[in-house]
Amino acid sequence: MKRAYSPKDIAAKKWVTLPWGEKWNKPFGFPAENASWFISGASASGKSSFVMQLSKELCKYGLVLYLSYEEGVNQTFQRRMEYLKMNEVQGKFRVVVDETYEELIDRLKKPKSPKFIIVDSYQVSEWEYPDAVALMKRFPKKCFIWISQDCLLYTSPS
């Protein structure tokens, strides 16, 4: 039987949190460094710009790997990087456009591997939900940020 936590057990847990400033702690508090995020929104709603700003902030706390499966490194991606001055985090920010699930695992097993992994987008990665869960369990000290487009579910009339 799995352990059941009491309120006292939960209150006693300690977390290593991101010590970021007011701009980020007001809306998000101080999340655990190894928290997993799921960011979802409609197409063209500003997700990519927000996530690029978040990436830049996360570079203060460790290496960031941005898996740009949806956009690649197209002109829009390039302009966004220029606009947000991502050159200021040179050496802390890397972009990959076509890495497989297995290649990502190999990368994350290395000693100086990224601390923050952004998957943009979950749908385009073509990973199954169990793959994502297995990745987070295998690398529990890393932060995974999953970007998703809103999807409409259609149920045929009965």
What is each of the regions a protein language model found here?
Residues 154-158:
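Conserved small/polar residues in nucleotide/adenosyl-binding loops
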Residues 113-126:
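Conserved P-loop NTPase "ATPase switch" module shared by AAA+ and STAND
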Residues 142-150:
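Structural recognition of the conserved hydrophobic beta-strand(s) that form the central parallel beta-sheet
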Residues 17-31:
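Pre-Walker A adenine-sensing motif
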Residues 38-98:
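Conserved P-loop
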Residues 127-139:
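Conserved Walker B catalytic segment
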Residues 32-37:
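Pre-Walker A (Motif I) flank of P-loop NTPase domains
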Residues 1-11:
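Charged, amphipathic alpha-helical linker segments immediately N-terminal to NTP-binding catalytic cores
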